[in-house]
């Protein structure tokens, strides 16, 4: 998910910097939330004291929002049975058999620390809530009405403490929803988008009825997929969205087959997981129907086209474009993951670049770090190792930079760069922007300024030779000076 060197440059360059703009870009996301998601650290943590320390650490690092799973099959009674318990009322959160204890503790911890909670209401559910319970496959064909009743129970129980819900997690992956495709004679056509649309249409009004002021997000799609050769291949996210909205590749309405009698899914926003794996944040996905962070423009264009075609309905306004919530984003590291990881220093660098890119997009409202602490590494790199800490709790370089991301954008002009930084938690802070000549140990302050209400500042600087930049700040007056990672800015060849 650096560089060395520094003396003051010449008077001319200094004058150019002194006259540079320091205000955030007009088209940037002014209210970008910082989130984190790691159920193992809080929701599933058997040590209450450790979970409390973790939540306190998150708050101190500037986290605004914590995503937690309301996992249907874990909360519901007798999830492996083919029949629901006799007399069980799934819409009633007080129905005997529901076990809310772990989620209750996690929500209370997060809210008590002053952070918001986003609940991902998701399967797999109980076997008895599927269309074919005899298969004992909890991921296969969940019954929309049953999911709607569970969603209502969740919103009834947590509505006073939760303002945002996500409907299902990564429905384009067979790990979460099946079948992904219907395959006949070697041809596979999307199935999961149509099942997901029915799940959303059942759960969204159920949540609204129990928690009228809530925001309900849909999507939460994984960023890449496969060319399908079986019914449970992973589906590419843009393929999924076209199926969800019943449009063809040119975003024209399609009302054939599973789209007959089409009625659109409705939502307040779109959740998305633009993990880059080993690809830099600004590197585009090689497949046109996949979308990483660099491809959000393509994703947004498709969402707009589907919405115009009547395939999705924004409940915040008929013509209002959907906001994006990046509810998972991370880079796995090597060590320990030698299959999909990058070096820990590269993780720190790319997470900061990703934070800048998310801020730069005015439609992005949330960026959530996934995860806090590495999972244990299984065969072939199984598990997630994108934490800010290793599994043994040792910090990675990204933990140091997380509360003070800093990036230098060389794409803004031929002989200029935009410096971007953020102090987390947000609020107005005094920062000092410094520079040094590569090879020098001396940093010189070139500008003192205040951040905006989200802790963000930008500064345009002239680029005439290689220079290192950083910013410094104090958490409180008299506290120790904290410094961002340095960024080297150099002229671009050919410009």
Regions found by a protein language model. Give the residues of each.
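Boundary/entry segment of secreted carbohydrate-active catalytic domains
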Residues: 27-65, 69-71
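Substrate-binding cleft and catalytic face of glycoside hydrolase catalytic domains
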Residues: 61-233, 275-277
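Bacterial N-terminal signal peptides
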Residues: 9-20
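Aromatic-rich peripheral "rim/lid" segments of glycoside hydrolase catalytic domains that contact
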Residues: 46, 82-86, 91, 157, ...
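Hydrophobic faces of well-ordered beta-strands that scaffold small-molecule active sites
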Residues: 32-38, 64-68, 117-121, 165-167, ...
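Short strand-edge motifs at loop-to-beta-strand transitions and within beta-strands
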Residues: 455-459
